[in-house]
Design a protein with these regions (language model features):
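N-terminal nucleic-acid engagement/recognition segments and initiation subdomains in replication
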Residues: 8-228
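Structured core elements
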Residues: 199, 287, 335-337
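Short, flexible loop/turn elements at secondary-structure junctions
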Residues: 204, 290-292, 340-342, 365
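P-loop NTPase catalytic core of nucleic-acid-dependent motor ATPases
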Residues: 217-318
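Conserved Walker
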Residues: 276-278, 347-350, 367-371
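AAA+/P-loop NTPase substrate/partner-engagement loops
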Residues: 302-354
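Conserved catalytic/switch belt of AAA+ P-loop NTPases
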Residues: 353-371
Length: 371
């Protein structure tokens, strides 16, 4: 295949041999000298055995070492050496290899929320011990100063220490961040109308296709790269149709009858609330009422299980207005269940507990408060 694509020319062969030598280098210093001989750079970072080093060539020390070697050869004590051997020996005597991190942090992509204008750099952190690489985010402030970078690195990866300078960090990231990939983000789970995509934890649905998140925690959909920042809501989704139990509609009817199917229709309809509002301007509420022990909780928990979530809802009277708003904005095209709305009252009609002003929900009807 490489031959057919014209990738086996002499210059290509030299590059492959160089890459192989880097891979097989026994020590960090051997690897550093290979890179210097190839690139001619006198300062650079390099990784070896999942540790990070900084290579520096002292040109004055190199010139002095070379002169001493040549003088030793001409005066007799030093055996004859070729120019290449003299150069290599002088390099060994004039280079400094400084360990700057006991791990290897790599910038993978830049993620940005266009609505909130928040942005982060997403990094992979490899360590020299067994185990998968860890991943996490750094802010712009944390990648511009060594002290802040060191704190965040240690926060994300246990025992990971960066001991280099701010200048070394800047030069290292200058190469890593050049033309870095950009990933768009949303801060909720569910349907993104702007991208016409459902983001459901480890899976996404776009144009009728089910997609799985890649190893770097985002979805690639054509030219679009996107991810959800909402991690607190977990959906356990089974994508294997062969293992799915298809007898549940019968059990739902036997347990709850037509009322169960009405709730089911509303529940499934919530998956398309944004699309319905785009056509009809609104999507209705559903109120499930009944005597104690009639199965309201069982029905709601069952419907949630259809969406892969072990959940019932939240009690708005036990939350602040800001807390309720956070709950409403965590999802899009997924149900929001408010439970225990009816309260016993004391004589005179006053409630035992603080009540909720249900007028708060008026603008949720047309999607202005909740998606």
């Amino acid at each position: 295949d490489l031959h057919q694509r014209g990738k086996l020319e002499e210059k290509d062969r030299e590059e492959y041999l160089y890459q192989g030598a880097l891979l097989l280098a026994e020590s960090a210093k051997d690897k550093a000298l290979l890179i210097y001989n190839k690139t001619g750079r006198t300062e650079f970072e390099l990784e070896h055995s999942n540790r990070l080093y900084w290579f520096t060539l002292d040109l004055a020390a190199y010139s002095k070492a070379k002169d001493q070697i040549e003088k030793g050869i001409s005066d007799g004590p030093t055996p004859y050496m070729t120019e290449t051997e003299i150069r290599d020996k002088a390099l060994e005597a004039s280079t400094v290899l400084q360990p700057i991190a006991n791990c290897v942090p790599k910038a993978l992509y830049y993620q940005r929320n266009e609505i909130t204008q928040e942005a982060w750099y997403y990094f992979s952190i490899s360590n020299p011990h067994d185990g998968p690489a860890l991943q996490g985010t750094f802010t712009a402030g944390q990648v511009t100063t060594a002290s802040e970078f060191k704190k965040q690195l240690l926060h994300l990866a246990p025992g990971a220490i960066y001991s280099g300078s701010s200048g070394q960090l800047e030069r290292m990231l200058l190469r890593q961040l050049d033309n870095i990939k950009v990933v768009q983000t949303v801060d909720y789970i569910g349907y993104s109308a702007a991208h016409k995509t459902y983001l459901l934890g480890n899976y996404a649905v776009h144009g009728g296709q089910v997609l799985e998140a890649n190893s770097e925690d985002y979805f690639e959909i054509g030219k679009l790269s996107i991810k959800s920042l909402q991690k607190s809501i977990k959906l356990q989704i089974n994508t294997d149709r062969e293992t799915q139990d298809k007898t549940w509609p019968v059990h739902l009817w036997n347990a709850f009858g037509p009322q169960g199917y009405v709730a089911l229709a509303y529940w499934i309809g919530s998956l398309f609330a944004e699309q319905i509002r785009a056509e009809q301007m609104s999507f209705p509420f559903l109120e499930i009422v009944g005597e104690p022990g009639s199965g309201k909780t069982t029905l709601i928990q069952f419907l949630w299980k259809l969406f892969g979530r072990d959940y019932e809802g939240f009690d708005p009277s036990k939350s602040t207005a800001a807390g309720r708003m956070r709950t409403f904005t965590q999802v899009s095209n997924l149900p929001i269940v408010l439970i225990e709305s009816d309260r016993e009252t004391k004589t005179g009609g006053s409630s035992h507990v603080k009540s909720v002003d249900w007028d708060e929900l008026r603008d949720a009807y047309n999607g202005r408060k909740a998606r």
